[in-house]
Amino acid sequence: MAKKVTVTLVDDFDGAGAADETVEFGLDGVTYEIDLTNKNAAKLRGDLRQWVSAGRRVGGRRRGRSNSGRGRGAIDREQSAAIREWARRNGHNVSTRGRIPADVIDAFHAAT
């Protein structure tokens, strides 16, 4: 019997819908990730804009925003779910949401 696992990322802020993107931001030396709908991601960026424009950039990437382009190509939700399922079956420790470690993604691609 085949088993199909579907993972749906839900907006972490209000839980009102499926998340469209993962937004990364930092404060006091701590980096955070939050899964948001496009509407809430735009609101977060808008709310932070005045603070960012008054601040100084001290590091980080100089790239345009993307959903998950980490140099390996974007991973869609179906592929992410498949990688997580493969990782668990093969003894890798992965969370149910958020970023999948690069070594797990590399191992998945090497095995498939």
From Swiss-Prot:
InterPro entries in the record, alphabetically? E3-bd_dom_sf, Lsr2-like_dimerization, Lsr2_dim_dom, Lsr2_DNA-bd
Q: Name one GO molecular function term.
A: DNA binding
Q: Which Gene3D superfamilies match?
A: E3-binding domain (4.10.320.10), Lsr2, dimerization domain (3.30.60.230)
Identify the Pfam families for this entry.
Answer: Lsr2, Lsr2_DNA-bd
Q: Which residues bind DNA?
A: 97-102
Report the locations given in the UniProt record. Answer: Cytoplasm, Nucleoid
Which GO CC terms are listed, alphabetically?
A: cytoplasm; nucleoid
Q: What is its main location?
A: cytoplasm
**Stretches for region Disordered:** 58-78
Q: Which UniProt keywords apply?
A: Cytoplasm, DNA-binding, Repressor, Transcription, Transcription regulation, Virulence
Transmembrane region positions?
none
Instruction: Indicate the quaternary assembly.
Output: Homodimer.
Its function, per the record, reads: DNA-bridging protein that has both architectural and regulatory roles. Influences the organization of chromatin and gene expression by binding non-specifically to DNA, with a preference for AT-rich sequences, and bridging distant DNA segments. Represses expression of multiple genes involved in a broad range of cellular processes. May coordinate global gene regulation and virulence as well as genes important for adaptation to changing O(2) levels. Protects against reactive oxygen intermediates. Dominant T-cell antigen and stimulates lymphoproliferation.
Domains: what does the record tell us? The C-terminal domain binds DNA and the N-terminal domain is involved in dimerization. Both domains are essential for normal function.
Say which family it is in: Belongs to the Lsr2 family.
Q: What is this protein called?
A: Nucleoid-associated protein Lsr2
**Source gene?**
lsr2
